[in-house]
């Protein structure tokens, strides 16, 4: 391990002990915000510190086994050599694990997200596919114990959605779903197709981290046009009786957001403003990512909505992620919400890219 990394890890151990002590301090416990921030920091540092301590222990085990191997007794030497081989293997594994744990963290990974799905080419079939995708993400969210809150929906004439926007909240939502942004393509025989021909349709998916209040983009009220209209969504007897739905247009950028799911105009307005702040922040993030991509092409992290990232082929029961050449013949499971089969390989590929970058920087 490089001395610079070891020095950084030793500083982390000191900080870990400091945070641990602070979490027992009565004044910190009384301050909910500070206690929450320190608890989050403790949870982030703990696995790194534990791994580093185990790695240092493995070095001590190597030294002890090396000394023991010098013993004149043949049985003792044999036992020491076995322990030495085991300790070295353990040390290498822990070294690799530490490198992974030391990779730069995306500060957005822990955030909630706004998920936007829009039907693209393919008319009614694209809208039906948008519905399938939303159901897939909803079922996956259920498995992860995330909350799903629909903010706006525009239903297709024959089912599904022309557009649907939802907020997903829970542990690590953005870190899990951030590689879902892009164009998703479906190949299947529509129910209305009498000739049995396979049609190709597409939807675009955008996953945006929810902007924190502290870092939200400042929005000048003079830059906004706010329109009210009658909700067209579900709601039984309350639908269309009041202009509770909100549409906000950000005049400098032309970005338009809507929220119509609440009966209260104030709640719809607050949610629409939150979505607008995230859209504006995401536009800035995309600009930065584009700039970074010019210097280093990332396979999985570009987040370009126009980029075709995945194909769902129903006749063959196949899902293909084009960025990492991943092909799975388990379409039914994936579309039913078993997204880990796709998400985990994408995260591993991204991790491998970061490790390669780290290795290049250390050369």
From Swiss-Prot:
Pfam families in UniProt: PCRF, RF-1
Top-rank lineage group of the source organism: Bacteria
Assigned keywords, A-Z: Cytoplasm, Methylation, Protein biosynthesis
Organism: Marinobacter nauticus (strain ATCC 700491 / DSM 11845 / VT8)
Record PTM N5-methylglutamine, positions in chain: 237
A cellular component annotation (GO) from this entry: cytoplasm
Description of post-translational modifications: Methylated by PrmC. Methylation increases the termination efficiency of RF1.
A single MF term (Gene Ontology): translation release factor activity, codon specific
Purpose of the protein: Peptide chain release factor 1 directs the termination of translation in response to the peptide chain termination codons UAG and UAA.
Protein name, entry field: Peptide chain release factor 1
Keyword Disulfide bond included in the entry's annotation: no
């Amino acid at each position: 391990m490089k001395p610079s990394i070891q020095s950084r890890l030793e500083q982390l151990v000191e900080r870990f002990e400091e945070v641990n002590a602070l979490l027992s301090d009565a004044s910190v416990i009384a301050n909910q915000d500070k206690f929450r921030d320190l608890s989050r920091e403790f949870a982030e540092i703990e696995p790194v510190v534990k791994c580093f301590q185990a790695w240092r222990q493995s070095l001590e085990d190597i030294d002890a086994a090396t000394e023991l191997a010098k013993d004149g007794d043949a049985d003792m030497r044999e036992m020491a050599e076995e322990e030495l081989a085991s300790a070295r293997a353990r040390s290498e594994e822990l070294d690799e694990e530490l490198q992974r744990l030391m990779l730069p963290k995306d500060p957005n990974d822990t955030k909630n997200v706004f998920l936007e799905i829009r039907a693209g080419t393919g008319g009614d079939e694209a809208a039906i596919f948008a519905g399938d995708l939303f159901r897939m993400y909803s079922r996956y969210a259920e498995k992860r114990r995330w909350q799903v809150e629909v903010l706006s929906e525009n239903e297709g004439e024959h089912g599904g959605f022309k557009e649907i926007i939802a907020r997903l909240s829970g542990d690590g939502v953005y870190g899990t779903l951030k590689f879902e942004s892009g164009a998703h393509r479906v190949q299947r025989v529509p129910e209305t197709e009498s000739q049995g021909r396979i049609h190709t349709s597409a939807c675009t998916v955008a996953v945006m981290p929810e902007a924190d209040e502290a870092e939200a983009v400042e929005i000048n009220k003079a830059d906004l046009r706010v329109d009210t209209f009658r909700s067209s969504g579900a709601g039984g007897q309350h639908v269309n009786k009041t202009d509770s739905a909100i549409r906000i247009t950000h005049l400098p950028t032309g970005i338009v957001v809507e929220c119509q799911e609440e009966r209260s105009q104030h709640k719809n307005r607050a949610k629409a403003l939150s979505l607008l702040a995230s859209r504006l922040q995401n536009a800035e993030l995309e600009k930065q990512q584009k700039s970074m991509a010019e210097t280093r092409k990332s396979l999985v992290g570009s987040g370009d909505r126009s980029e075709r990232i995945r194909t769902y082929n129903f006749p063959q029961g196949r899902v293909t992620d084009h960025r990492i050449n991943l092909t799975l013949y388990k379409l039914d499971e994936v579309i039913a919400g078993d997204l880990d089969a796709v998400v985990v390989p994408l995260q591993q590929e991204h991790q491998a890219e970061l490790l390669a970058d780290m290795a290049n920087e250390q050369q």
